[in-house]
Amino acid sequence: MGILRVIAELDLQDSWLAAGTLRNYVWNVLSGKAGLAQASDLDVVFYDVNVSYDETLALQQDLQQRYPAYQWEIKNQVYMHSHSPNTLPYQNARDAVSKYPERCTAIAARLNNDELELFLPYGDDDIVNFVVQPTPHFLEDKKRMQVYRERLAKKDWQKKWPNLQLFDE
């Protein structure tokens, strides 16, 4: 909960710990490994039209200096649709998370009034059963599916978690 407290104290609009940080944590725990690997990025997402790209980078650098034990990756989801082919701007952080490439990566957590809040738009079956498959958003577009397939090859997740089941459709 310490990392979630740090994120909550940033007081960023619509902010979450998300994506690979949580996916990898779950897979590590279920595989009997240390939950948060030292080399893991901490994927922090937020949504605020009033925070520029440069301000986001400055915030990331500040966090890196204050908490050097972690590799912070802070992304304002206002700008991130441009990294996904044929994708309209996201409406909020949840919209962005729901359109990540893999269903098991579409996961986010935060503290809301000091209570854990989880967002799993596709449920937890894929992540707890070590299944990697594209989200509906990626399935509906050939260019996005090419990005998805390139990610599968690049990430080489089965080397770390050999029991993963990878689906490319």
Residue ranges and their predicted role:
Residues 1-169:
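Catalytic cores of the polymerase beta-like nucleotidyltransferase superfamily
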